[in-house]
Amino acid sequence: MLSSVLRTRIAAVSGRQIAYGGAVNVLAPKPAKLAIEVVHDLVCPWCYLGVRRLLRTLARRPDLPVELAWRPFLLNPDMPRAGMPRADYVMRKFGGEERARRLYGSITDIGQAEGVKFRFERMRRTPSSVDAHRLVRWSSRFGRAAELVEALFAAHFTDGRDIGDMSVLVAIAASCGLRAGAAHAFLASDCDTDAIHADNLRAHRLGINGVPCFVIAGRHAIAGAQEPEVIERLLDVAAVEAQFLGVGE
């Protein structure tokens, strides 16, 4: 599993060294947007927390232009497309309700501090996240991906809705300003299903075996639901690097 702050190059980038602390040219062109790949699963509570912290960090740094790319990671790649009863999943994943309750209690407490309401008791099914990831990928064409991701997390973890159900997904898409008919037509097809599985495989090949994971400028990665201050520090490092190497969008 990736370390908390992994400052290695996970993409094939040159081995040029960078000297920090030098003079900055204030007349330099406006920096390109910093590319951030958000590797996540929509059924992962830690991803909900991590994404919330990332977006909160970015909101307080309007000086830092970024381009978000939402990359799927399948924690349950063998999950039936129709999902499974929550009780069966908890037994298979945690070995019983008691262990799950302890874990969920800890996550719920952390969520409260972030303004995230986890209501695990409302969940009746554990869905496959493939179609939800497909919908996010589709929504990115219309600039709605970040909004949709947060809406999907809230629907699943707060409202207990089945985000593997097509009617639920269409309703959530519509609530984010997307056309319900177009969303339904897309989900009814097989479009991007192979792409979701390919992106999941790519993440594993990069050495990512846990989420959330934020890959910044193809050179650095930060794993886990880190505090905003930790995220911000790495973003600043990557932004300085980008000025020297021309790494960006």
Explain the meaning of each model-derived region.
Residues M1-A11:
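Extreme N-terminal basic, low-complexity initiation segments
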Residues S4-V5, Y104, A132, M166, ...:
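Generic alpha-helix initiation/capping and coil-helix boundary signal
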Residues V51-D159, L245-E249:
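Structural alpha/beta surface segment adjacent to cysteine/selenocysteine redox centers
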Residues A11-V13, G21:
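Intrinsically disordered, low-complexity repeat segments enriched in small/polar residues
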Residues I18-Y20, N25-A32, V38-V39, V43, ...:
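C-terminal cap of thioredoxin/glutaredoxin-like
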